[in-house]
């Protein structure tokens, strides 16, 4: 009898997860296990968290029992989530170096945590690496190291865990910010590895890199190229952000939706694409813009309702 209930619950989850969900990155400083309830209370149906301090390469690992309970809370509140890996992970360092090995340990720790959380976790998002000058590497060598890092982390973690590669903003020495670079990484993996690697499209980042997504035409062009070179079915989620800086600025500064340089026409087109392909939208917006109608800083509820109206 218990088995039938579990199968039924799983079937319902599969059906419900095949629709576009809306949410945002949330802070877990007020409690880790209570984070799903908090996310639900503010209106999220999907959310993102760091498991530890984002600027620390090796935060203390979460306890097994709290990770399992966290997963139960996701089921209770009908939520999907994704873990964002430490900002300091850099797989472009030479394999065997202390910084490379520490990056692997950090990523493996988070992947193992998602295994305990369960199948309502989309995986672990990591940034593109940086080809820092002290390593004296070519860009291709740095990308080769990045591929080695992915392969290494996958080989040390359960087969049901997933790495999600986030598009970069071309800041500084960041590699593979363009679709060609992402494809170079992806197609260096074998079939089994590719099954465990997905992508997160950050709208602010691709705008900063030089993809003009301010119009439906530009949005269609970007996703058409991505589909041709990688496949849109490999997009796990979209970091849905406007940008405070101009096209091809190579500067990563998120803006609230419709209060930045990308604007409503492009953002609406992205929401429409997400709905068509059932891709989840996760906002990382600063919520610092002033609503001219209220003369107050905008709230997540305002952004949520805005995006929800675009998905109708």
From Swiss-Prot:
InterPro entries in UniProt: AP_endonuc_2 (IPR001719), AP_endonuc_F2_Zn_BS (IPR018246), Xyl_isomerase-like_sf (IPR036237), Xyl_isomerase-like_TIM-brl (IPR013022)
Gene Ontology terms: biological process: base-excision repair
Cofactor binding note from Swiss-Prot or TrEMBL: Binds 3 Zn(2+) ions.
Keyword Transcription regulation: no
Gene Ontology molecular function terms on file: deoxyribonuclease IV (phage-T4-induced) activity; DNA binding; DNA-(apurinic or apyrimidinic site) endonuclease activity; phosphoric diester hydrolase activity; zinc ion binding
Residues noted as binding Zn(2+) 3 in the record, renumbered to the chain: 205, 252, 254
Residues noted as binding Zn(2+) 2 in the record, renumbered to the chain: 166, 202, 239, 284
Entry-linked PROSITE patterns: AP_NUCLEASE_F2_2, AP_NUCLEASE_F2_4
EC number assigned by the record: 3.1.21.2
Pfam families the UniProt entry points to: AP_endonuc_2
Catalysed reaction equations from the record: Endonucleolytic cleavage to 5'-phosphooligonucleotide end-products
SUPFAM superfamilies (UniProt xref): Xylose isomerase-like
Entry binding sites for Zn(2+) 1: 84, 127, 166
Known cofactor(s): Zn(2+)
Keyword set, alphabetical order: DNA damage, DNA repair, Endonuclease, Hydrolase, Metal-binding, Nuclease, Zinc
Highest taxon of the lineage: Viruses
Chain's role: Endonuclease IV plays a role in DNA repair. It cleaves phosphodiester bonds at apurinic or apyrimidinic sites (AP sites) to produce new 5'-ends that are base-free deoxyribose 5-phosphate residues.
Protein family membership: Belongs to the AP endonuclease 2 family.
PANTHER family for this protein: APURINIC-APYRIMIDINIC ENDONUCLEASE, ENDONUCLEASE IV ENDODEOXYRIBONUCLEASE IV
Record's protein name: Putative endonuclease 4
């Amino acid at each position: 009898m218990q088995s039938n209930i579990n199968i039924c619950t799983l079937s319902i989850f599969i059906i419900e997860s095949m629709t576009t969900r809306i949410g945002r990155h949330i802070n877990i400083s007020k409690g880790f296990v209570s984070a799903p309830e908090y996310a639900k209370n503010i209106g999220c149906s999907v959310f993102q968290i760091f498991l530890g301090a984002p600027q620390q390469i090796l935060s203390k690992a979460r306890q097994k029992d709290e990770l399992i309970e966290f997963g139960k809370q996701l089921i209770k509140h009908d939520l999907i989530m994704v873990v964002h890996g430490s900002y300091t992970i850099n797989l472009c360092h030479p394999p065997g170096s202390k910084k490379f090995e520490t990056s692997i340990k950090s990523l493996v720790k988070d992947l193992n945590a998602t295994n305990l959380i369960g199948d309502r976790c989309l995986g672990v998002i990591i940034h593109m690496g940086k080809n820092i000058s002290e390593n004296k590497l070519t860009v291709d060598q740095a990308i080769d190291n990045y591929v080695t890092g992915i392969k290494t982390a996958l080989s040390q973690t359960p087969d049901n865990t997933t790495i999600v590669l986030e598009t970069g903003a071309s800041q500084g020495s960041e590699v593979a910010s363009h679709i060609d670079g992402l494809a170079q990484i992806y197609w260096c993996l074998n079939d089994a590895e590719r099954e465990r690697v997905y992508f997160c499209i950050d709208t602010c980042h691709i705008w900063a890199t030089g993809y003009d997504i301010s119009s439906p035409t530009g949005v269609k062009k970007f996703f058409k190229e991505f589909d041709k070179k990688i496949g849109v079915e490999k997009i796990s989620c979209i970091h849905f952000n406007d940008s405070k800086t101009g096209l091809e600025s190579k500067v990563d500064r998120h803006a609230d939706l419709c209060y930045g340089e990308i604007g409503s026409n492009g953002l609406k087109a992205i929401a429409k694409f997400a709905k068509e392909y059932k891709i989840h939208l996760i906002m990382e917006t600063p919520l610092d813009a002033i609503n001219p109608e209220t003369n107050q800083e905008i709230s997540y509820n305002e952004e949520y309702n805005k995006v929800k109206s675009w998905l109708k």
